UniProtKB/Swiss-Prot annotation:
The keyword Transmembrane helix applies. Belongs to the PsbT family. The chain crosses the membrane at residues 3-23. PANTHER family: PHOTOSYSTEM II REACTION CENTER PROTEIN T (PTHR36411:SF2), PTHR36411. It is found in: Plastid, Chloroplast thylakoid membrane. The gene is psbT. Found at the monomer-monomer interface of the photosystem II (PS II) dimer, plays a role in assembly and dimerization of PSII. PSII is a light-driven water plastoquinone oxidoreductase, using light energy to abstract electrons from H(2)O, generating a proton gradient subsequently used for ATP formation. This is Photosystem II reaction center protein T. One of its GO terms (cellular component) is photosystem II reaction center. HAMAP family: PSII_PsbT (MF_00808). It is a single-pass membrane protein. It comes from Pisum sativum. It comes from the Eukaryota.
Amino acid sequence: MEALVYTFLLVSTLGIIFFAIFFREPPKVPTKNTK
């Protein structure tokens, strides 16, 4: 049971960090490079 909780915490933390970086950096690059 504890392993599941720790895994969930790890995944959620990684997801938050990934989303923070993803939404913070590429709003300028893909806007200029539109096909």
